[in-house]
């Protein structure tokens, strides 16, 4: 099970716990991943994604799943998100 956000690409980071005596021990910073169903307005359908809490806030700010996917770069999106993006693009071109 991979700990990567499907919409933003945020993943596990590594660092140190630092004690009072300045000893450093390795640790991991885990992303705040949530399993959510996101609704596509153009397709009238919900899709399940594993996303970080910050991405959910960004989706609300941008105006929904469709707007976010169309403006996002394919480099940061997962394979499933890219497929959904293509479906949304094709659906938009048919309705125009």
Swiss-Prot record:
Record keywords, A-Z: Ribonucleoprotein, Ribosomal protein
Signal peptide range in chain numbering: none
Recorded GO CC terms: cytosolic large ribosomal subunit
InterPro entries, per the entry: Ribosomal_bL28, Ribosomal_bL28/bL31-like_sf, Ribosomal_bL28_bact-type, Ribosomal_bL28_sf
SUPFAM superfamilies xrefs: L28p-like
Any single Pfam family the record assigns to this protein: Ribosomal_L28
Domain of life: Bacteria
One Gene Ontology molecular-function label: structural constituent of ribosome
One of the GO biological process terms: translation
Alphabetical list of NCBIfam families matching this protein: L28
Family assignment from sequence similarity: Belongs to the bacterial ribosomal protein bL28 family.
UniProt name for this protein: Large ribosomal subunit protein bL28
Gene: rpmB
